[in-house]
Amino acid sequence: IYRRIDDLFLDPEAFRPDSMLGVPGLMRAWKAGNVALANAPGAGVADDKVVYAWVPDMIRYYLDEEPLIPNVPTYRTMYPDEMQHVIDNIGDLVVKPANESGGYGIVIGNRATRDELDDTIARIRADPRGFVAQPILSLSTVPTLVDVDGQPAVEPRHVDLRPFILTGEYSYVTPGGLTRVALPKGSLVVNSSQGGGSKDTWVIDSMFSTSPNAGER
């Protein structure tokens, strides 16, 4: 199990009893050796966004291989030259707190006011290790059922698709993925904690999609 939620919400039997996010009994199963937890309780290395920038180096070091998929360019403001690049180009970047999750604290440069950008630069200078920055990616839009002034309407909303790779005896890419949608109009933040949602992802079998009688099947 890859843990992404905070320790306190992981298991209502062991931590916060009011947690609706965790799995009752998970800590007992973990201690008994019946399940493995990546990003184990008490550790937070997988939650640190700065680590992402070193993933290609980790692959080379631990696997002695070259990454097959390139990383999104990630600027670590802990390094003076990268910090200066972020400051000089902040209007074209998205700045993220290194240890926040759920979309909190994110500043999207081309959608922020000058005051917000200046405040972000000041916070970066005060805590260089606490931030990373990446280019702003263009998200696709899909027709989405939304509420407009109390009435249902279909309007475009930004989405991202997250495919997953499962590894057991063999490794494979799942046919489909998690589609997250930014429900506030114009928003690029798809996190549910920021008002985002999810959508079904349908993968059409090419054999059926090209058949003249596909609609009858």
Predicted segments, located by residue:
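Domain-scale recognition of functional cores that engage charged ligands
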Residues: Y2-R217
